[in-house]
Amino acid sequence: AIAAVATLGSLLFGYDTGVISGALPYMYMPFDAKGLQLTSFEEGAIGGTLLVGAALGALLGGLMSDRWGRRHNITFLAFLFFAGAIGTTIAPNVWVMYPFRVVLGFAVGAASATVPVYLAETAPKRIRGSIVAIDQLMIVTGQLLAFSMNAIINSLQGGPKITIAEDPSGHFTPNTYAFDEIAKLQSSKGGPMSAEQYHAFLDQLSISAGNGEAWRYMLVLCSIPAVALWIGIRLMPESSRWYLAKERLYDAIGALKRVRVPEKDGSIEDEIMEMVEARQHEKDEESQRKGFSHVMATPWLRKLLLVGIFLAVVNQTTGVNTVMYYAPKVLEYAGMSTSASITAQVANGVMSVIGSAIGIWLILKFRRRQVLIGDVIGVGITLLGIAATFQFFIAPHMANHTTPPTWAAYLILGLMSVFMLIVQSSNGTIVWTMMGEIFPANVRGIMNGTAIFCMWTANAIITWTFPPMMETLGGGITYTIYGVLNLVVAVVLFKIMPETKDKSLEEIEVEM
């Protein structure tokens, strides 16, 4: 029951980061068609502001959890998930939406720092490993759920539509059109208009109707699991280990009794004694705990921190979130219709879930170093395949204002699906595992927090800059940059990445 309830936080993590991919095509519609008439910069900002909030949440979530308790913190985060979902849903424009995206992002980041700890501290030993692995699986399941709901809502809407009452420029007669027909006028999609000309064209249209509000239906669904999490977590006990950290022994015993079956999990008294001894050991460590200045003044720790930050950033330079957030828009650039691209995103979600399940097996069977380096090389090759498809089979048609062949868009989709399978099967799993292994206990908090903050910051930068890059540089150059970057990263990893599997901290220290 605890796993089912607590992992709703991870489901929300996945849902809130994934839902935007289907909402953006409707947000691009004109104001009079009930969209937000986004520019590429605003599109990037909608994704980026969530990740700025997530960086802050990851930085502060652990502190909040230590002060208030895991359960109370998750309860508060459920409220933030709900408030962020409702706020973004009713936002009349992007400037009102941005702060609510930051709130939503804060909940996402803080949940990433709190939920795994709560699960690890409350789960019985016999299922602890599988429950924490399920937590990671729930994130990608949440993204798949978001993609699926987006596809259903889009299908019910019949795709983005707009009714033009009058077009002074003479491009369109009064009628109802698929918004794709209007969007094709952009130079980035093979049309004759620059971004500025296109937005000026939209402003002069007289629009009588449109279904651009569909993005609101997609976003409001985020509130349902938030309510379920808020109700469910209030029925769960606090972490017994947190109670012990606060010297509340009797509360710790009571909490443990609620989540243990003595016939399966052994003596509660014995486990409490183990926890008391572990807590005493932690106190001894805390007396020796050092700060950030100690890390920077110690050469091997400083090098280890840089390796940890590099690993965290590598988790994002794969470009995984350019697919999670923007795949439908990328597929539109490749010539696929909006409706088809929103539905096609479900395939990426399925491959992501399969990849995450494979990752649980890979990390047990192979060495961390060889898996991650192989993953990054595979990612680089796949991204260069996407770049080549754009450059040689799509860009020439855009330049000539002709329609790219249908198979080219589906080739892009196929390469994206392979990309998601590769990146989710090893990159995230390896990076998160290694960051838990390479940092010494007396500085683990500050070093891990710094690395995670850098990861979310890199995520925000990539998410914010990707839409303008696609619009100005095109898919060929944009994906070439990411592909080459990953091959360079693979070389750097080969030179600096330590192997941590089956090694003690002392052995890692000698390597560094």
Regions found by a protein language model. Give the residues of each.
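Transmembrane-helix signature of 12-pass secondary carriers
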Residues: 1-257, 270, 276-512
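Boundary/linker segments of alpha-helical solenoid repeat arrays
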Residues: 264-270
